[in-house]
Amino acid sequence: MAMNNWYECRVKFEKVLENGTQKKVTEVYLVDAMSFTEAENRIIEEMTPYISGEFEVTAVKKDRISEMFIDPDGDKWYRAKVMLITLDEKSGAEKKSASIMLIQAKDFQTAIKNLENGMKGTMSDWEINTLSETVIMDVYGVVARDSSEAEAKPAE
């Protein structure tokens, strides 16, 4: 399985609110790319059909997500810091290493359930250190380039 390189992209644009007024907003998206340049190009490509008028990519930063658990019914993204617990064979002491995971869910309880389901079969013990809702609006995974109608989907 290929390792994903996730980049958090901030996009600033004018959005029409529910009451009909326009307001400048900055939204956060996650993009799978090989470099900062590719991440910027990908977010421009993904956002162009959805934004009328001008928009600006104001920031691109690398995000160190090791796992992603997708729930098609979820409309929010949660970031979990999970501590993987291993035993040091020499000293016999417990060793904890942090891993950042992104979970799609409809609410906090579902995020915990989705994380637990995703971690089933994990060889080492683990515990949730933190779990919080993110401001990520959407995730754009790897795009299949061999089809003209290829769609970006979150990596599974």
Kindly give the residue locations of the regions a language model identified.
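The feature marks the first
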Residues: 1-41, 84
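Intrinsic disorder/low-complexity detector
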Residues: 1-7, 22, 45, 49-85, ...
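Residue-level signal for functionally critical sites in structured catalytic/ligand-binding pockets
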Residues: 12-16, 26, 40, 44, ...
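A cross-kingdom feature marking solvent-exposed beta-strand/loop segments within repeated
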Residues: 15-32, 49-52, 92-101, 121-128
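Generic "edge-of-domain/loop-turn" microfeature
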Residues: 16-18, 36-38, 67, 87-89, ...
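A short, charged, amphipathic alpha-helix used as a generic interaction element across diverse proteins
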Residues: 35-51, 107-122
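Short, solvent-exposed interaction modules
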Residues: 57-123
